[in-house]
Amino acid sequence: MAKSVLKAAPVVVGLTALMERHADALSSQLQAHHLKVFPPHSEKGIRTFGPSEASKLLGVGESYLRQTASEMPELNVSMSPGGRRMFSIEDIHVIRKYMDQVGRGNRRYLPHRRGGEQLQVISVMNFKGGSGKTTTAAHLAQYLAMRGYRVLAIDLDPQASLSALFGSQPETDVGPNETLYGAIRYDDEQVAIERVVRGTYIPDLHLIPGNLELMEFEHDTPRALMNRKEGDTLFYGRISQVIEDIADNYDVVVIDCPPQLGYLTLSALTAATSILVTVHPQMLDVMSMNQFLAMTSNLLREIENAGAKFKFNWMRYLITRFEPSDGPQNQMVGYLRSIFGENVLNFPMLKTTAVSDAGLTNQTLFEVERGLFTRSTYDRALEAMNAVNDEIETLIKKAWGRPT
């Protein structure tokens, strides 16, 4: 008679230990992937631009760009294999400054804020993941900087996807007190906001990175409310307070908000002059946005009653991941326009493999090389992205009272 073989009892692993183990394993693999894509001595950067794209970024005709470039012998412009001039983002930055100095008439080529124009703080938000919130914030910040504005991008999402897109890995490149939390925390370890601002590979675009440390603000705030002293700034005013300290350095601040309604998001809303809500045109996403709007309005009413003051210029809904050939999506877009009217941006951001494939290597459309895609795929994606960002730039100009 064969002896029965006793099977060893399965090892019971605690949930906390299992999640820690998986987090460590995934973190090390992500770091290895980052090093493979961007070796230690390589740097992220914006691709070069031909004369047509460069002239559009500068807001001039190609002939004037050629004439100006010929007047600048110090300009070392690269050449394409076909013999075309290719301009780096640094070249465009230098040319813009030169044009502003020697330009004819009253034409201004540096679009910096002028006397009386208020710093524009745009909070990009949504309650539901997958709406393209971070992709929108990243491309908007880069586009405005490439157009000559002085831009600060703030990653307020503990997942820190915006930081990763800009080359700052949250696990390895962002230390304690190096997120916005360091500048808005309640204790004696608070630092000046200048300490957490870092440069990027685009002239006049700065970043305040994020990581999981931002969650500490959600934990600290209830204690701070209980132990509040006379003169303490409440949670909803802390972001606007520190932004005010560096307002003179920037024209636009773009905040990538967390995908939930916590103290961080409410503070970002209070600091904002404008709100951009991303929405995927499907029923579940729209239902989620309805809950988001209802909860947000209730909470903002409570904050207003507590003394908060809002500096509001505009609020817009951006349709994202839009497929023009999808009938139900077109119906949903029409439904949203019938309810919200002009508060829905005219141009949607299309669903395209160019954006998703660029994201696999933590790059934006302005960074990834056009040659990696079929020309029609890339050009279609870039045209849609530029149309969205140009419409937002127009809203910024209107808020300043400038002609558009």
UniProtKB/Swiss-Prot annotation:
Keywords: DNA replication, Plasmid, Plasmid copy control. This is Putative replication protein A. The keyword Nuclease does not apply. InterPro entries: AAA_dom, DNA_Partitioning_ATPase, P-loop_NTPase, Plasmid_partition_RepA. This protein is coded by a hairy root Ri plasmid. It is possibly involved in regulating the plasmid copy-number. SUPFAM superfamilies: P-loop containing nucleoside triphosphate hydrolases (SSF52540). The keyword Cell membrane does not apply. Disulfide bonds: none annotated. GO terms for biological process: DNA replication; plasmid maintenance.
